Amino acid sequence: MNFLLTLAYDGTNYCGFQVQPNGRSVAAVFQDALEAVLGTRPDIKGCSRTDAGVHALGFRLNFHAGTRIPPEKLPLALNQHLPPDIRVLAARVVPEDFHARYAAHTKTYLYRIHNHPIDSPFDAAYYTRMPKHLDEVRMQAAAQQFVGTHDFLALCAAGSSAAAHGDTVRTITDCHVTRRGDEIDIEVTADGYLYNMVRILAGTLCEVGAGRMQPEQIPGILAGCDRSQAGPTLPAKGLFLKCVEYPDMKENHS
């Protein structure tokens, strides 16, 4: 059977989702739990390769395994063998040819900013602090300029294989900025992403919010395909993979 699982994890203590030769990855720890529960170590296919320090609220992965454990019982069974910073939220059976990455229709990322001169001692690992006041109205105006199908090379970090192959066109279907008190959330939904794209996009919006860029500059930055014209790459700790949507699948958020 092919199982699709939804995970949430705190990426602080991991080198990312993907198995790495010299680092503790979410995938390796999850495979340890699978082996403890199933007696085998199946290959797992993640929906994304989240980087070191990036968190997930609704990460999707699938694997093939033969087990008598019903899917609704898998979360509890696996969570008993996982550390507290990784949790299985839901499980279901999907078609044999389903692939969590290639079947994804859209992925939504959330970037959290604490806009205050003083850091919080409680959740500083889950946002990036910006001490200077940011104008969220200007940021929202700039965010709308990213919506659509564009060449996002200007928002791509150096060393990207996609950039090397000229594969840098993506479609953003939604990009918006909201403020709640001192917290600013940047949410982006797209059909795919380039390396560090969301962190650079968030950094660019912060430049606009701080008055160092104008919202009207965004189309020119995208058209120029020049990384140096966009904003800085913000830290990984403020980034969350929020959800992954699949076409024709009910209960996409479960």
How does the language model describe each region?
Residues 1-254:
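Structured-RNA-binding interfaces characteristic of tRNA pseudouridine synthases
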